[in-house]
UniProtKB/Swiss-Prot annotation:
The gene is xseA. Keywords: Cytoplasm, Exonuclease, Hydrolase, Nuclease. One of its GO terms (molecular function) is nucleic acid binding. This is Exodeoxyribonuclease 7 large subunit. GO terms for biological process: DNA catabolic process. It is an enzyme of class 3 (hydrolase). Its main location: cytoplasm.
Amino acid sequence: MLSSQTSSIFTVSRLNQTVRLLLEQEMGQVWISGEISNFTQPASGHWYFTLKDDTAQVRCAMFRNSNRRVTFRPQHGQQVLVRANITLYEPRGDYQIIAESMQPAGEGLLQQKYEQLKAKLQAEGLFDQQHKQQLPSPAHCVGVITSKTGAALHDILHVLKRRDPSLPVIIYPTAVQGDDAPGQIVRAIELANARGECDVLIVGRGGGSLEDLWSFNDERVARAIFASRIPVVSAVGHETDVTIADFVADLRAPTPSAAAEIVSRNQQELLRQIQSAQQRLGMAMDYYLANRSRRFTQIFHRLQQQHPQLRLARQQTALERLRQRMGFALEARIKQATQRQQRVSQRLSQQNPQPRIHRAQSRIQQLEYRLTENIRSRLSEQRERFGNAVTHLEAVSPLATLARGYTVSTTTDGKVLKKIKQVKAGDIMTTRLEDGWLESEVKSVTPGT
């Protein structure tokens, strides 16, 4: 009889191991509520305590890497909600739970509801970015849905008055805490949409516990915000408080004051922007005028450089240089001829060739005469060419035309007026006379017949 059952015999170690595996695999992770007792924290930083109710108790451990995420200090007798894994301590055969997270019992139940509703609405797409409405910029009227006696309303109105005193504000007073609050918030959102007075809504309240903020975790409020045709800015609690309303709203503000900052324009900043734009415009105008003045000066200098008198002066200078060069050349030729004559005379005096001397002298005289006549002819030609050039320049000079009573008119950008279609009534034009300029306004334009 004993031999047939030997395959079912467990050692104590194997039994405890098998039970541990069954507990861990079958039970998995569970939520347990109970009262804390025998709480200890050794130097290792781990927590050891007993979780009990009226009729039973279980040993619990919460290791340091998990308990450092707990936001409160557990106390003896405190009711808590623990998320834990069930296991068995094999050396003693004691089963225990290993806690992963811990919350006060009341908040823990609310947190469970919060997570369940969040998952549900997220699955339905209420949090999707594609459904978010664009906030008006700027807003012309702001609706505020909150308690009329709360600090949140005071903060919102204070910021709006400071930033944009002229911005209209409509208050839709509601309860923000208690059983009636979700229904009132929903009705206020629906009323604001029905009246259509505002182009943006701030829905929120001041900070508080999870229970205090629970109205903004209500499914009815979330669906009313999602259905609102008016963009909604949520402003619930402090920056660390995140509600279901924050996920559904078109934009979440960390605080009520921040919501007021978001929906309003800063008039002082707007004034500074206008002043900055005026300064930039003034600088642009100054630069344009300076550039046009510089351009006018350049054109004026070019016209001066092309003045007939300057051209005549340059021609006279060139002619004088030519005359000097010709004089120097003549003197050099005469000097060379004289020197040659002297050398020849010296040789002839030594050889006494009188006939050759007479011929050479005659030849020299002829050369001197021809050279002199050639120089005189060249000088006469140059004087004649110079006179013709002067006559031609005076004939084509704009000043000569102006001296005969004609004028030249130009537009403000320096273009010479040739046809009446270049101007229209009201334009300013500049007229050049012989002795100066006139600036005039075109009163009318009449085509020629």
